Amino acid sequence: VVEAAAEQDYEEFGKKNVSSMDADAVKSALLEAGLFAFIKQRPYDIIADPTVTPKGIFVSAFDTNPLAPDFEFALKGEEANFQTGLDALAKMAKTYLSISVKQKAAALTQAKNVTITAFDGPNPAGNVGVQINHLDPVSKGETVWTIDPQAVIFIGRLFNTGRVNFTRTVAVTGSEVLKPAYCKLQVGALLTNVFAGNVTTDKDLRYISGNVLSGKQVSPNGFLGAFHSQLTVIPEGDDVHEMFGWIMPRFNQFSANHSYFSWLMGKKEYTLDARIKGGERHMIMSGEYDKVFPMDIMPEYLIKAIIAGDIDRMEALGIYEVAPEDFALCEFVCSSKMEL
């Protein structure tokens, strides 16, 4: 058994003035402290290669996924660290900060050393991939980096305090959470105490580190993902038996393509479970992906090229600037029940 110490010891990296540092010095500091692992690159949506100079670094300061945390709330008290983090990123490449038109925090709307763009619209407007596609698309031979806004705060803490502090503000959400709330958690934190006594107990549950569309399934005794600022709990749905399946007319269940009459009832809240409600079948070229994919890319043709392993066609159709999360809504509405 490994027990936590009563007091936490920190390795001291020393406070640093970012304004007097060059790109190599910033990069070395992040690598030494282990913070470079929070920077991803496109193409491939993998940990960024520090030997490659990106044409831009993109930060999305808002999340439009279901029940997503409000970054303005997480930003309170961390404004100075956030700006320092942006300053550090700007030393390495031109940095783009994407915000929502609804956000009013001065630390976002008046951030320095970055190009600020305000976005409006429903999910997936908050996806950094959508923002890259509209601001500076990635072509063959080009690289961009992405980083989530709370990781920008991690970087700011490093330079302002000389210490690594992986504390995140995490939203505990989902229809099966008794008291949805924000909490402070370390990256990789054990989730047992977060869920204990705070979820329903009369059904099987799906625990997710992240959101329901692109998060990762965990156990109730699992751990917080390194890139996640949200925890979600929904019904598993494996105990539900419905007469005649999808053929039965219903007024209380959601359907993306109006298969049920519930769309006649106007906007309302639904309790969705983890069921796929059907088996995987042949891909149907229906145009349904295009309705939820606001990028200058043809998603159905790109997916077909990926399935066929046609690299030339993948390159021509935009494989370099997308990530799995960009296809999350496509997977949700997919009539073929394909795992994209």
Where in this protein do the model-derived segments appear?
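Buried, small/hydrophobic-residue-enriched core segments of structured protein domains
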Residues: 2-340
